[in-house]
Swiss-Prot record:
Gene3D superfamilies cross-referenced by the UniProt entry: Zinc/RING finger domain, C3HC4 (zinc finger)
SUPFAM superfamilies per UniProt: RING/U-box
ZnF (RING-type) ranges: 214-273
Ranges of Basic and acidic residues composition bias in the record: 42-60
Cellular component terms per the entry's GO annotation: cytoplasm; cytosol; nucleus
UniProt-annotated location(s): Cytoplasm; Nucleus
Organism: Schizosaccharomyces pombe (strain 972 / ATCC 24843)
The protein's name in its UniProt record: Uncharacterized RING finger protein P8B7.23
Keyword Cell membrane: no
Region feature (Disordered): 1-95, 649-673
PANTHER family: E3 UBIQUITIN-PROTEIN LIGASE RNF10, RING FINGER 10 FAMILY MEMBER
Length: 673
């Protein structure tokens, strides 16, 4: 024990020997009856025989007060020794000394001890190695969305609610006229890179297969159409009215506050609930393609051979290559709207004069519609005048910007002239414009399309048939007119599809493409088609099996929909009625009919079939129904067969001593014997 420590039995004498003899934990302790109080000797013996309880609180409660003090002092001593041992081990590891009594109770040393030491007194010295793992960094800018039980994302990329998804959709399905001062190097190298919405001046849409009705007036072809960031199309007059019309909440707030209604500069899209601002909408130009063809299965289609140079995003007909004297087909640059390649480009560089001309066409269209409304209804919409004034202001601002940027436009014109002169020099060195060098052909991709920007291509088997017939892609004819057997649509461009079909590398991701399967019996020789006979027949069988499978799915879906409707309305599904078609000649035979000359057996069979009972609905009744009714008539008591009664009452010859049977008649109310 430590010096100066008080014993658990009370005040101890100054003599250490006597104190050690009285201390139960001391090795000099001598048990005797004199050392134990008489009153507690019996209790001490019983407590020594019993096993210690697990719970320390119950153990201390059962002990005398003096023994409780002894146990508490023992615990303090053990804890103190353990701390001293751990602190000494830590001091040895870090090179400190415990000679100073303050070092044992140093707070810093105790913190190190509690952090580095386990229950067994072992010390972790990894901090002395000066080794540390590099922190994990996420290479992606956006973290992955949380995993959900549903199979689709509710937000983020791929859900349709993310701005990037909408910009990718617009980038994949439309063409653009962009500002001449923008930087489009990323779009030339990567078709998936969307054009900045601020650089877009006009959106080009096909009037043949990209018409979108206005969600407000339901006009099939919107007037002075405008497109928002989300890709939805509206009439300019409808959109302006929608934005400027206050909502019920705004009117109520203005009435309560006693102020004017504040005009809101934005509204939510009625289709996708995305924010719409008037400054973010861009005009739309409806483009009509003279080469447009509506594809139908079983009809012929004219296919043109298109060419795309390696690394370029411009695909053009190979037959038009010799007529492009402006160099648009010989350069990888984005063409201007005046070049020949602008009709086949997805991104076109515009000019202020071009936009002024387009705005004037919109004003002319609005005036024509206003005149029609006045002739029909007596008045025109006031928003037509508002839109006309907005377009006139836009034209004036464009004219001012043209005057300010004369130097820049002059420089661009000089660059275009230099480019055209270089292309003319290059073309003049070539004797035959139709002959293309082998290096250019090796770097170019050839494919068939019905018309520009149609995204309709031949299936892989058809391409193999053509290559087997013509030898190589360079020998393909510029035009082919096969018969379409099947159209497979709904394929989206992705990395897999690009890896499989190299000629689709210029299409942006998310673009929808279709493949057609054609009948080449009138174009390709029969000897070539015989080599692919098994594959063609297999493809046709698969097509028929798919059609049957789709028909079964359609019928099943219709049946499930009907069942759901009947279950929601708590109605029972009606049972289809069986309609019996009868020949009037058989139902009403005439005297001169040919049935009179038939055999008696056939007549009997016909009579038996005609005599069968039928229900009031025209269906055939069961044969035993009539017999059952006859039995019931016999048992009702009102129709008695007296001949049968006489036979039963007459005595039989063989029965001499037998008792006669008595007949019970039910003609009266009670039975009489």
């Amino acid at each position: 024990m430590l010096n100066g420590e008080k014993s658990a039995l009370g005040e101890m004498p100054s003599n250490s020997n006597s104190s050690s003899k009285l201390n139960a934990k001391s090795p000099n302790f001598i048990p005797s009856s004199s050392n134990i109080p008489r009153s507690s000797a019996k209790t001490k013996e019983h407590s020594a025989d019993r096993k210690p309880h697990r719970n320390s609180e119950k153990k201390t409660q059962g002990m005398p007060r003096k023994n409780q003090q002894l146990a508490s002092s023992e615990r303090k001593t053990k804890n103190k020794k353990r701390l001293e041992k751990q602190s000494s081990a830590i001091a040895d590891s870090i090179g400190e000394s415990l000679d100073d009594p303050q070092t044992v109770y140093d707070e810093h040393l105790f913190d190190i001890l509690s952090a580095r030491t386990n229950k067994r007194g072992q010390i972790n010295l990894n901090h002395l190695l000066n080794f540390q793992f590099t922190p994990r960094t996420n290479s992606n800018a956006f973290s992955a969305p949380p995993r959900r039980s549903r199979g689709y994302n509710t937000y983020g990329q791929g859900s349709g609610h993310h701005p990037m998804d909408k910009s990718r959709y617009v980038n994949a399905n439309y063409r653009f006229v962009v500002s001449p001062i923008g930087d489009y190097q990323s779009q030339k190298l990567d078709p998936d890179s969307p054009v900045k919405w601020e650089d877009v001046w006009q959106v080009l849409c096909s009037s043949d297969f990209q018409l979108a009705a206005c969600p407000f007036c339901l006009e099939e072809k919107p007037v002075a159409a405008r497109m928002s960031r989300c890709g939805h199309v509206y009439c300019f007059s409808c959109l302006l009215r929608f934005v400027e019309t206050p909502t019920a909440a705004e009117v109520k707030a203005a009435e309560t506050s006693g102020t004017k209604i504040v005009k809101c500069g934005h509204r939510s899209c009625p289709i996708c609930w995305d924010s719409i601002r008037l400054r973010d909408v861009h005009p739309i130009r409806w483009v009509e393609d003279k080469e447009f063809q509506k594809l139908e299965e079983g009809k012929s289609v004219c296919l043109r051979l298109y060419q795309r140079n390696n690394g370029s995003i411009l695909a053009f007909p190979r037959s038009c290559r010799s007529f492009a004297l402006d160099g648009s087909f010989h350069s990888d640059e984005i063409p201007n709207f005046t070049m020949s390649g602008a009709a086949y480009a997805r991104i076109i560089i515009g000019s202020h004069d071009y936009m002024v001309q387009q705005h004037l066409l919109e004003i002319e269209q609005l005036q024509q519609i206003a005149a029609e409304d006045i002739s029909l209804y007596g008045s025109a919409d006031t928003y037509y005048e508002r839109i006309t004034q907005i377009l006139l202001d836009r034209i004036s601002s464009l004219s001012e910007s043209v005057n300010e940027q004369n130097i820049k436009s002059l420089q661009t014109d000089i660059d275009n002239l230099c480019l055209q002169s270089n292309s003319l020099k290059q073309l003049s060195e070539v004797d035959d414009l139709n002959d293309v060098s082998g290096s250019e052909i090796a770097d170019a991709y050839l494919f068939y399309q019905p018309f520009a920007h149609s995204h309709i291509y031949l299936s892989p088997l058809d391409i193999r048939i053509l290559k087997s017939a013509f030898g190589s892609y360079e020998n393909f004819p510029d035009e082919l007119v096969p018969r379409v057997e099947r159209i497979s649509s709904g394929h989206l461009v992705n990395s897999e599809l690009r890896q499989r079909f190299k000629y689709m590398a210029h299409l942006p991701e998310g673009c929808e493409v279709a493949f057609i399967e054609c009948d080449w019996s009138k174009i390709i020789p029969k000897e070539v088609l015989l080599t692919f006979k098994s594959e063609i027949s297999k493809r046709r069988k698969q097509r028929k099996a798919q059609e049957m499978r789709e028909e079964r799915y359609r019928q099943r879906a219709e049946r499930d929909t009907e069942e759901q409707i009947y279950s929601e309305l708590n109605m029972q599904r009606p049972v289809p009625k069986t309609v019996v078609h009868e020949d009037p000649a058989e139902a009403f035979p005439t005297l001169g009919s040919h049935h009179q000359f038939e055999s008696t057996d056939e007549v009997n069979t016909d009579e038996s079939t005609l005599s069968t009972a039928k229900t009031v609905w025209g269906t055939r009744a069961l044969a035993n129904i009539q017999n059952d009714t006859d039995d019931q008539d016999d048992l009702d008591g009102w129709k008695v067969d007296w001949d049968k009664v006489a036979q039963l009452s007459a005595p039989s010859k063989n029965s001499k001593n037998k008792k006669k049977k008595k007949l019970v008649l039910l003609s009266t109310g009670a039975a009489h014997r």
